[in-house]
Amino acid sequence: MFIKGNFLYTPSCHELTIRENQYAHIENGVVTGFMTDLPETTGPETVVDYSQDIIIPAFVDLHIHAPQYINRGLGFDEELLPWLEHYTFPAEGKFADPVFARRVYTAFLKRLQAEGTLCFSAFATIHKESTWQLMELAEAMGFKA
């Protein structure tokens, strides 16, 4: 498969690479190389054209608490321990209900996707069924976790 577009990425923290109007060759979900022209044997069904777009890598979040999604924006006036006691621990107790967990985790994952985060290392709760739901939803939505 080939993706045509304008690619922007950083091979190192002090280096920016721009590949304008090029093709990325993708094998098994991995970019194997870039080229300015397609091989002659390439059929149109193997090319996805984003030539009017800028393509950047997805973001990776290495430390995120999925159940705290429902706490976002709450308790800015609290120190850590009171915040945990007033907001986090009561909220995380609700994840004993798998229906509640599925609803929250679905919203959480959709938000990550919308912001370009497609890979993460997440903390869940002590509730085994709800934690499995998070991982199953993430896999079904195409995340790497």
Report each predicted region and the residues it spans.
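Generic anion/oxyanion-binding catalytic loop in active/binding sites
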Residues: 13, 44, 90, 94
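Short C-terminal domain-edge/linker segments immediately following a structured domain
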Residues: 32-39, 64, 78-79, 89-93
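N-terminal metal-binding scaffold of metallo-dependent hydrolase/deaminase domains
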Residues: 1-42, 53
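Flexible loop residues that form catalytic
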Residues: 11, 65, 125
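Alpha-helical scaffold segments that flank or form the walls of functional sites
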Residues: 25, 72-123, 127-143
